[in-house]
Regions:
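SDR active-site lid
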Residues: 163-230
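The beta1-alpha1 cofactor-binding region of Rossmann-like NAD(H)/NADP(H)-dependent oxidoreductases
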Residues: 35-36, 57-68, 100
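Residue(s) in the substrate-gating loop at a strand-loop-helix junction
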Residues: 138
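Active-site helix of classical SDR
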Residues: 118, 151-154
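Conserved glycine-rich Rossmann-like NAD(P)H-binding loop of the short-chain dehydrogenase/reductase
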Residues: 24-40
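Substrate-binding pocket helix/loop in short-chain dehydrogenase/reductase
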Residues: 94-107
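Conserved glycine-rich cofactor-binding loop
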Residues: 10-11
Length: 255
């Protein structure tokens, strides 16, 4: 069986991707900070889908712990066929008053970790001429919304670059750019979401299913939901002052 490694695998998009891939017969390497919860997910999926599930407890802001995941990805005796760079978090406060250490941790998780993990897994994929990488970005990557948007913009552009660089191979790279998705993400970030209209929410299973279809089809940018396809299209063609105002308006509503 092929093996998939998923970061941030205990909840939200990561957990949904783990379930989808297990259902398709992939063995799993699940990565997260919460080991008891991680083992619970691994046990549940192993039992339900008759697959093997490894766990790696790792805080991706810590270089030594990130290195453990890199080492597993580089182990070609147990190759990783699919890498899902999903781990992440958001910050509620404006950059002007936020904790600088938290801002740095956000960059460590959203930028440094996916870059290093992709670099670790790609040599094996290139040697086998097979593999897929999904970088979980955001529609926030198309607007101006602080460090989070900037980091997600990196992921989107990085994915586009790798997709193009590897176009003559059988390796697929895709950026998943969801909008507001019903997960623990916003509650954990203590963001105010009560005023968001119901039609702006997307279901996590549908988000992941569309992403995986796009990966299989070799498509580089996946934006689930008609509302976010429209929003991203507007963001790409609108004058930048309009995009900047939209970004700051959305951010301020979450505080």
């Amino acid at each position: 069986m092929a093996t998939a490694l998923i970061t941030g695998a205990t909840a939200g998009i990561g957990a949904a991707y783990a379930k989808l891939l297990a259902k398709e017969g992939f063995d799993l390497v699940l990565v997260a900070r919460d080991l008891p919860r991680l083992k619970g997910v691994a046990k549940e999926l192993s039992k339900l889908y008759k697959i093997k599930a490894e766990t790696i407890k790792a805080d991706l802001t810590k270089p030594a712990q990130l290195a453990k995941v890199e080492k597993r990805l580089a182990n070609n005796s147990k190759p990783i066929e699919v890498l899902i760079n999903n781990a992440g978090f958001g910050l509620k406060d404006s950059f002007l008053v936020s904790n600088l250490a938290k801002e740095q941790e956000l960059l460590d998780v959203l930028v440094t970790a996916p870059m290093r993990l992709s670099h670790a897994v790609l040599p094996g994929m290139i040697k086998r001429n097979s593999g897929s990488i999904v970088n979980v970005s955001s529609v926030a990557s198309f607007i101006a919304g602080g460090t989070y948007s900037a980091a997600k913009s990196y992921l989107t552009v990085f994915s586009e670059y790798l997709h193009t660089e590897l176009r003559d191979t059988n390796i697929k790279v895709s950026a998943l750019c969801p909008g507001f998705t019903r997960t623990e993400f916003h509650a954990r970030g203590k963001m105010k979401m009560s005023g968001l209209p119901n039609y702006m929410w997307t279901a996590v299973d549908q988000v992941v299913a569309k992403s995986w279809r796009y990966v299989k089809a070799g498509k580089v940018i996946c934006i689930p939901g008609w509302q976010y396809m429209l929003l991203s299209s507007i963001a790409r063609i609108a004058p930048r002052p309009v995009v900047r105002k939209l970004g700051i308006k959305i951010r301020r509503k979450q505080r």
